[in-house]
Amino acid sequence: MADTTTAAQADQKPTRAFGAGRPQRGAGGAPQRGGPRPQRGGQGETKSWTPVTKLGRLVALGLVENIHEIYLFSLPIKEYQIIDKFLNLKDEVMKIVPVQKQTRAGQRTRFKAFVVVGDHNGHVGLGVKCAKEVATAISGAIVAAKLSVIPVRRGYWGNKLGAPHTVPTKVTGKCGSVAVRLVPAPRGTGIVAARVPKKLLQYAGVDDVYTSSRGKTRTMGNFVMATFFAITKTFAYLTPDLWREVKLIKTPYQEHSAKLSEKQQ
């Protein structure tokens, strides 16, 4: 009798509550695997940075504490991690256009991405990248935009009261047939511009400005690049307030030459 009871218990399958043991589903209905996705542009990467340039080594060692030390001596930035260390940038894709090339096998289609980065406080960059896939083009354009980040010089329309809010003087940028002109505006005017240059000026931290454009502005790539070239010219000249004599100082390479030689050994 005992053997019969044991055999019956062995034949019975274990029961479980409905839904028990299944992976929990998120709001979208798919099982949640791992943590949140990393953001675009390398914001979620946890890889350690190993600098390969002299400037990168100085930044990693903490010997260069401010990005304006780099701009002061016009040192070339060839690693985007240097920009990430000093600035908290936001990026936005302006446009993605397909481009084609005629080959023997037929037409080869690739995607061209225009990306703007900036911190809304005097730093802006523009990157252009062409790749076979959209995601590759966007990530490459973000890196190119970070490497092209420039300081934006801001000024006043009238009396020098409060914080700088507009461009210091009239500046013009040109790309292809498109020419964009930036004109200082009174405080409170806002950015009087089309959608493309307005977005770039917002990322640059300019609050009030008049703009005028001419040429084939429908070509958005030339339109945004002409605006970027105009912003670049804000630091292309010296106004009388910058004529004062400045004591010459050593570049970071000269000042920390001993540390660089130790690192190379």
Swiss-Prot record:
<keyword id="KW-0687">Ribonucleoprotein</keyword>
<keyword id="KW-0007">Acetylation</keyword>
<feature type="modified residue" description="N-acetylalanine">
    <location>
        <position position="2"/>
    </location>
</feature>
<dbReference type="InterPro" id="IPR013810">
    <property type="entry name" value="Ribosomal_uS5_N"/>
</dbReference>
<dbReference type="InterPro" id="IPR005711">
    <property type="entry name" value="Ribosomal_uS5_euk/arc"/>
</dbReference>
<keyword id="KW-0689">Ribosomal protein</keyword>
<dbReference type="InterPro" id="IPR018192">
    <property type="entry name" value="Ribosomal_uS5_N_CS"/>
</dbReference>
<dbReference type="InterPro" id="IPR020568">
    <property type="entry name" value="Ribosomal_Su5_D2-typ_SF"/>
</dbReference>
<comment type="function">
    <text>Component of the ribosome, a large ribonucleoprotein complex responsible for the synthesis of proteins in the cell. The small ribosomal subunit (SSU) binds messenger RNAs (mRNAs) and translates the encoded message by selecting cognate aminoacyl-transfer RNA (tRNA) molecules. The large subunit (LSU) contains the ribosomal catalytic site termed the peptidyl transferase center (PTC), which catalyzes the formation of peptide bonds, thereby polymerizing the amino acids delivered by tRNAs into a polypeptide chain.</text>
</comment>
<dbReference type="GO" id="GO:0031012">
    <property type="term" value="C:extracellular matrix"/>
</dbReference>
<comment type="similarity">
    <text>Belongs to the universal ribosomal protein uS5 family.</text>
</comment>
<dbReference type="InterPro" id="IPR014721">
    <property type="entry name" value="Ribsml_uS5_D2-typ_fold_subgr"/>
</dbReference>
<dbReference type="GO" id="GO:0006412">
    <property type="term" value="P:translation"/>
</dbReference>
<dbReference type="InterPro" id="IPR000851">
    <property type="entry name" value="Ribosomal_uS5"/>
</dbReference>
<dbReference type="Pfam" id="PF00333">
    <property type="entry name" value="Ribosomal_S5"/>
</dbReference>
<dbReference type="InterPro" id="IPR005324">
    <property type="entry name" value="Ribosomal_uS5_C"/>
</dbReference>
<feature type="region of interest" description="Disordered">
    <location>
        <begin position="1"/>
        <end position="49"/>
    </location>
</feature>
<dbReference type="Pfam" id="PF03719">
    <property type="entry name" value="Ribosomal_S5_C"/>
</dbReference>
<dbReference type="GO" id="GO:0003723">
    <property type="term" value="F:RNA binding"/>
</dbReference>
<protein>
    <recommendedName>
        <fullName>Small ribosomal subunit protein uS5</fullName>
    </recommendedName>
</protein>
<dbReference type="GO" id="GO:0003735">
    <property type="term" value="F:structural constituent of ribosome"/>
</dbReference>
<feature type="domain" description="S5 DRBM">
    <location>
        <begin position="89"/>
        <end position="152"/>
    </location>
</feature>
<dbReference type="GO" id="GO:0022627">
    <property type="term" value="C:cytosolic small ribosomal subunit"/>
</dbReference>
<feature type="compositionally biased region" description="Low complexity">
    <location>
        <begin position="1"/>
        <end position="25"/>
    </location>
</feature>
